[in-house]
Amino acid sequence: LKDRRVRRALALTIDRESLTENILKGGQIPAYAMTPPDTKGYFPPNKLEFNPAEAKKLMALAGYPDGKNFPETEILYNTNEGHRKVAVAIQQMWKIHLNIDIRLTNQEWKVYLDSESNGDYEISRAGWIGDYVDPNNFLDMFICGGGNNRTGWCNEDYDKLILQEAPKKKSDQNRFAIFLEAEEILIDEMPVIPIYTYTSKNLVHSSLKNLNPNILNQASYKDLFLSDDLE
């Protein structure tokens, strides 16, 4: 997994559309980059579409033609039936398309967090929900030594873009150009593999008005009101 060609091959052999439609079934959105699309008007690069043929070439270049001599590798996930189903599906995809063997390990939440924090894993399932609406909230996770960077990955060029260049820009348009350049590095190096973007389902009574959906799923309660005109 120290070889980025292997990491990219793994990313290219996850069929995200099949995963979201047939396994998750909750309206989740296939993710082809680290940042959700249209986060404050930012659109990330889209370079991770399902491509088993390219993945096989990358594995061969890395010294593992048709999966030969590739060591059995582990996927760690916290105990949850949904996470188990996703892990099993990815395990099967990698076996079918790359002919590699994957071992699944589940741990209770606190044990799992310790394993991830200590780097005691090979591949680990993880998730992130943004605290505020800005692509920086997803991209600054992967700076060298960052508290949320549990990958062991460190890239000085990436850090410079996120920590030095982007903050200098006064407009979102110029900041987003820097973020796009940084995310290109992230996708090329592939320390993490984006799979899908969370969605939320809400039951809303027809009398509730002025509920404006937003990416954080946070209602502005001062703007809500009830109407007697039921639809």
What is each of the regions a protein language model found here?
Residues 9-43, 81-91, 113-231:
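Detector for C-terminal structural segments
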Residues 4, 52-74:
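Immediate post-signal peptide segment of exported/extracytoplasmic ligand-binding proteins
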